[in-house]
Design a protein with these regions (language model features):
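Tandem repeat scaffolds
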Residues: 9-22, 29, 33-425
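N-terminal acidic, proline/glycine-rich, low-complexity intrinsically disordered segments
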Residues: 1-7
Length: 425
């Protein structure tokens, strides 16, 4: 008969200490080894936030209903454990083992599950019912999580939410994903052989390297998804080598249009370039171009026309986007730390005028914008949920109609900025 592993039978504190948790884990270890005095870890509805179980053996342990936000669970073994309705948001689950674990109703939003093993785990809906209320159960939430290289072979994940998750090279073979939501997720080179995907939503997903034959016929919504069949125009089809076109473009900029020619890469798939770090591409035109995952650190793209471009998961730290048109561009999971989206100023009719950066209708979910400058930037009707604007200069920016759910604004300058509801800073 399982016994809670509470030392000396004392009641656990509301917020458990690391030393108390370590003591329980040691008792559980003895239990799993069949040693005298061992007790199975049964911790239910406790607050373990911020603690560590790194590399610990927690097979068959019970953490049902626990708050486990921001915990370091990397390398831990939760094989056949119960994490029913747990809150694992922002936890480090790198290479964590959840084989045959009960994760029904768990909330795993923004967690790092890179290399985690969830083979045959139960990821169906779940929730707690009390005498006062009935909870029909919530779906497992992986929104924005990093599942790169994770194994979910044979898992039960009907109606699970993987929106905006990083799922490159994930193993979903034989998984039950009926009704699951993958909108905006990166499934590059994912293995979906034998997966049940009836009714799944894969709108705007990245599916390059995925066998579409394993998806077709399942009633999956692939609207606006990127596949090997529609990646866009190839740079191989350019009439002139790209290096020469860039040279002509820079000459065009330097002579204010008198010589050379503006570079137009609209509709091209540029991911094959891998890196444009430090490049000077002022006034580039690239409407609807695809840059996903590229290293563009310190790139100069002032006064460029980049609306509807896809910058998901790009490294754009220190990038210069001043006065650039970025309407309806995608930046989810992009690294935009210390980037500059400020205006450029020019003289016209004896007056100083500002050319601002426009990001109306853009998607910046989960983007890291810490320390960036967005002075007078227009974010009208943009989706900025979970974006990190810590320490940003947002003076005079326009957030009218923008979704700022769970976005971080700690230490941000918001003087003169327009919000439907001002955020806490």
């Amino acid at each position: 008969m399982p016994v809670t592993s509470q030392p000396n039978n004392s009641p656990p504190p509301q917020q458990m200490s690391q030393s108390y948790l370590d003591e329980m884990v040691e008792l559980h270890k003895k239990f799993m080894e069949g040693r005298v005095g061992g007790r199975r870890a049964v911790l239910r509805k406790l607050n373990l936030s911020g603690l560590s179980l790194k590399n610990r053996d927690l097979r068959q342990a019970d953490f049902s209903g626990c708050i486990m936000r921001d915990m370091d669970l990397s390398g831990a073994n939760f094989r056949e454990a119960s994490l029913y309705a747990c809150d694992l948001c922002n936890a480090n689950l790198n290479k964590t083992v959840f084989v045959r674990a009960d994760l029904r109703g768990a909330r795993i939003e923004s967690a790092d599950l890179a290399g985690a093993n969830l083979d045959n785990a139960d990821l169906r809906a779940g929730g707690f019912t009390t005498a006062e209320s009935f909870n029909p159960g919530q779906n497992v939430n992986f929104r924005g999580a990093n599942l790169a290289g994770a194994r979910l072979s044979g898992t039960l994940a009907t109606n699970a939410d993987f929106s905006d998750a990083i799922m490159s090279k994930i193993d979903l073979t034989g998984a039950d994903l009926r009704g699951a939501r993958f909108e905006g997720a990166d499934l590059t080179e994912a293995d979906v052989k034998g997966a049940q995907l009836m009714g799944a939503n894969m709108r705007s997903t990245i599916l390059t390297g995925v066998r579409l034959d394993d998806i077709r016929g399942s009633g999956v919504d692939l609207t606006d998804s990127i596949t090997d069949e529609n990646v866009g125009k190839s740079l191989k089809d350019l009439d002139t080598p790209l290096a020469k076109l860039i040279k002509e473009h820079r000459n065009w900029v330097a002579t204010v249009g008198k010589e050379g020619k503006q570079l137009d890469l609209s509709g091209y798939d540029l991911r094959v370039l891998l890196s444009l770090s430090g490049e000077k591409l002022t006034a580039l035109k690239a409407v609807g171009a695809r840059w996903c995952g590229m290293d563009m650190t310190d790139i100069q793209l002032q006064s460029a026309t980049l609306e509807q471009s896809d910058f998901r998961s790009c490294f754009l730290r220190g990038a210069d986007f001043r006065a650039t048109n970025l309407k309806k561009a995608r930046f989810s999971h992009a690294d935009l730390r210390n980037a500059d989206f400020s205006p450029l100023y020019f003289e016209a009719g004896g007056q100083k005028r500002a050319s601002v950066c426009t990001m109306d209708g853009s998607n910046m979910r989960y983007a890291n914008c810490a320390g960036a400058k967005f002075i007078k930037t227009s974010f009208k009707d943009s989706d900025l949920a979970y974006a990190d604007f810590t320490g940003c200069d947002l003076s005079g920016a326009d957030f009218t109609g923008a979704n700022i759910e769970n976005a971080k604004f700690k230490g941000a300058q918001i003087e003169g900025a327009k919000f439907d509801t001002p955020p806490a800073t």
